[in-house]
Amino acid sequence: MNNHKKLGILLANLGTPQAPTSQAVKAFLSQFLHDQRVVDMSRWLWCPLLHGIILPTRSPKVAKLYQSIWMDEGSPLMVYSRRQRDKLAELSQRPVELGMTYGEPSLLEGVRKLQQQGVEQIVVLPLYPQYSATTTAAVFDGLAKALRQLPVVPELHFIRDYHDHPLYIQALAKSVRASWQQHGQGDLLLCSYHGIPKRYAQNGDIYPEHCLKTTELLAQALGLPQDKVMMTYQSQFGKEEWLQPYTDKTMEALPRQGIKKLDVICPAFSVDCLETLEEIAEQNQEIFLHSGGEAFHYVPCLNDSQSHIELMAALVKVDC
């Protein structure tokens, strides 16, 4: 990239509803579930199902879940994302803006804010360590669509993934060790990743390979033998088969296998959100304890930790 042109950073993530209300959640889910990267069914079949059944029934339920985790400053995903933006800007001494694939601030808004600061080159960092067409590629699609609305298109550099970056693995290991120091080490470290339909992987999505590599490297960094770490997939919906083993089913089975104290980390999530704070730290903890488990400790996402910000700065610096 041209070093004489001002460079800025766009941190991209999935997005979040604007408020923990049925109306706001419905608007967010509608945009999210309309993306063919997320659901690749025929639009003739999917859209009537989405608008006739899924959105009317799921939106009020999901809104209640958001209410249980909502912070004074807003949605956890947005709160931590803003902190990441501010800390990365301070560390890198470059303009940094947020762009969400769905919801606000949009990818287009993020690019425009950077251009208003005189930025001509943008490094796009999707905060998905493991590549998937359902997440990372959706950022690229959304950005390409956004650029059509700009009179001047900036020079762009995309960071596709960082699932095996040494600083990423070190940051994960540090967070696990901090949990062990506070709560003691459990019988097993379970790495729960957001799932995707199995068919997507069979059609070439490399996401499961990236998840496996991250898990292996994290186990090595922690000095854990193979029988002390496990990988599962969460957040599946619909009747189609998703990547397995499923996190919730595993929670039911582990106590019967002698696992009474469990540590859980979600390496695919760069910030805590509904899927980590509610689905894992609340729902799945309840499943594990109800099934005979004795202790469940959720290891928070990297969020705006110093090690995470240093990782981001390194990713941007190396790829410029």
From Swiss-Prot:
Single GO cellular component term: cytoplasm
Disulfide bonds: none
Pfam family, any one: Ferrochelatase
GO biological process terms on file: heme biosynthetic process
Subcellular location: Cytoplasm
Catalysed reactions listed for this entry: heme b + 2 H(+) = protoporphyrin IX + Fe(2+)
Top-level taxon in the UniProt lineage: Bacteria
Keyword Iron: yes
Major location (coarse): cytoplasm
UniProt GO molecular function: ferrochelatase activity; metal ion binding
Record-listed E.C. numbers: 4.98.1.1
Associated pathway: Porphyrin-containing compound metabolism; protoheme biosynthesis; protoheme from protoporphyrin-IX: step 1/1
Keywords for this protein: Cytoplasm, Heme biosynthesis, Iron, Lyase, Metal-binding, Porphyrin biosynthesis
Keyword Lyase set for record: yes
Chain positions recorded as Fe cation binding sites: 194, 275
Family note: Belongs to the ferrochelatase family.
Listed HAMAP family: Ferrochelatase
General function of this protein: Catalyzes the ferrous insertion into protoporphyrin IX.
Protein name: Ferrochelatase
Organism: Vibrio cholerae serotype O1 (strain ATCC 39315 / El Tor Inaba N16961)
